Swiss-Prot record:
Residue stretches of biased makeup (Acidic residues): 17-32
Main location: cytoplasm
GO biological process per UniProt: rescue of stalled ribosome; ribosome-associated ubiquitin-dependent protein catabolic process
Protein's name according to its UniProt entry: Ribosome quality control complex subunit 1
Phosphoserine modifications at: S56, S61, S63, S110, S111
Region Disordered, annotated ranges: 1-35, 51-122, 634-656
Gene: rqc1
Stated role: Component of the ribosome quality control complex (RQC), a ribosome-associated complex that mediates ubiquitination and extraction of incompletely synthesized nascent chains for proteasomal degradation. Within the RQC complex, rqc1 is essential for the recruitment of cdc48 to incompletely synthesized nascent polypeptides that are ubiquitinated by rkr1/ltn1.
UniProt keywords, alphabetically: Cytoplasm, Phosphoprotein
The family this protein is said to belong to: Belongs to the TCF25 family.
The organism of origin for this protein: Schizosaccharomyces pombe (strain 972 / ATCC 24843) (Fission yeast)
Amino acid sequence: MSSRALRKLQRQRQTELLEEALDSESDEDDEFSSTSGKKVVNVFEILEKENNAINSEAEKSVSEEEQDEPLVEGESPIVSTNKKAKNKKKKKKQQKKKKVTGKRDLDNQSSDNEKLEGLESSKNIDDDIDEIEKAAAELKLKYREQDQVEHVAGVEESATIPLDKELDEKLNKLLGVNISMLNPDLEIRKIFGRIVEKRSVNARHDNLRRKRHVLVQPQEGWPPLVRSGLGMKLTGQSQDLECFFEITQSRAYQEVQETFEYYVQTYDPNNLLMLLRSHPFHIDTLLQVSEIIDQQGDHELSAELVARGLYAFDSILHPRFNLATGATRLPFAIPSNRRLFLCIWRYLQSLQSRGCWRTVFEFCKALLQFDMSDPYAIGTCIDIYALRRREFAWIIDFANYLENSNKISDTPNMLYSSALAMFYVHGDTTDTRASMLAAFERAPYMLSELLDTLNISFTKSSIPSPQDPVQELHSAMYALYAKDSWSDPTVLAFINSILEKETVTLHDVEGQFAELTENLSRRVILLNEQSLRKFLPQRILQGTILSFDPLPPDTYLSESQVFGRDISRRIASFLSDYLSRAREVNENEEEPPAHEFDLPPAEQLLQQIESEVGEESEDGTPVMTRLRSFFGSLFTSTNSETEPAEESTEEMGQGD
């Protein structure tokens, strides 16, 4: 019998017992009323007597047929079915008004039959339960063997999972941003309490009714943001759930951008201020004016302008843009994306002056996950912010990730910071000493300047010096920005103990770079620290550094940069020389050679450019094909505009 049938049988049995209890109560009530009260003649009593007589005769005949059969325990003398049980209940209900003696006899007989039926049903239930338990045991044995097979298969499958995928998942977890901690007001309130809040209760309630923002909270007095001209689109998604985004610009925004670039070349701040009044959420204008105001000493207004630019980005975030996943990507090679990088970095600088180290730390994680190539070299400073915020466990986990992915050599600062974090967590232990010694031995070029900053002397042996500009920069930056975390007296005593008691073996680390890498150079420009600018290559120092786009990468994905950086420079240089020579010719009133008049002016210029520049750029871009089309349309439109003017002049002369 199935478990469903057993449950159904149990429900029926419970229903029968409940109805019998109700019937017995009603019978007792009837008996009490019949004995205590005066007997009342019922008109239906005659019919009931006749029915009782017929039923008694039927029961008597059935009992006579079964007299010869012996009674066995557990068997019922009457074949009981659900239908018969229901009929008996109906009969009982019809016989409520019968005589007391007859009702007692029928009730006794019915109770005996029900007891026998209960014994039989309980025996059947026990048999069915035994069968179910036996079947369950067989199934358990079967599925246990199947689970063992699946477990072995799962172990084999997990062993085949690529290590790179596991590392990527670990990195995404490490770079996941706590969205609530991107609000510096929450951090300040947590440190100093609500007493620092100057807003009224009504103002706080008004802010609660506003839209929840991710990057920055809008401030009172800002102009309303209707349409900034910016947008964000999802450009792709990888199998590892990485979402790639691109910030888009409308045609009107691009026209404002062209105006901004023209005003920058005029070196007149008033033009930028005028542009900012008419377009209060143009990103490059906000950043440029913010830098000018910061140089004048108004740091609060400068930070407010940067926050306004970040608010413009916050208003266009894509629904799939989720910094908490650690897998949000904004390729740095796209020029429009670089504005968000720069805006966040400028915002971080203002937060550092307020001591909001947790907010700075969370924004650094966002910059790291935007582009895994780390264009701002955040890996060289995020550990310093984590130390200030006492995120020791995160530093140790991130250093382990870099070690497992063979990237620790690019960020030697993580060797020192992870060892320091272990000391803060575990104290002076064997593992902590081993970690600190490993940092000294693997990156000894950083030790000398750090010890000098901490006023610690080491005379056992000479400390190796940096062997290339990259090692020099790492040593200088870490000693400059991490000294506060190493200045604790317990840390100084720990370092002195290691240098005096432990055997420290230091060797030179071979240099690999003749000059700073592009990312490190960009970081030096962003830091704007005069003591570090000496490490920049001369080609960068002698070139033009744009504050609104510092050191853009060599590869552009924008339509306005189709020729490439090298070709654009060479074309611009040639055109400048060409125009200078033409100006000198006009001043000297010398006529060009006769053969130059055989070709149209555009063709002359194109031939000279082709001889100077070449047909293709370094990456194989067909420059001259596009340039010929451009010059052809340019000169055609120019001729079409000048011809009607000449005709009108002739008509005017004829009219005169």
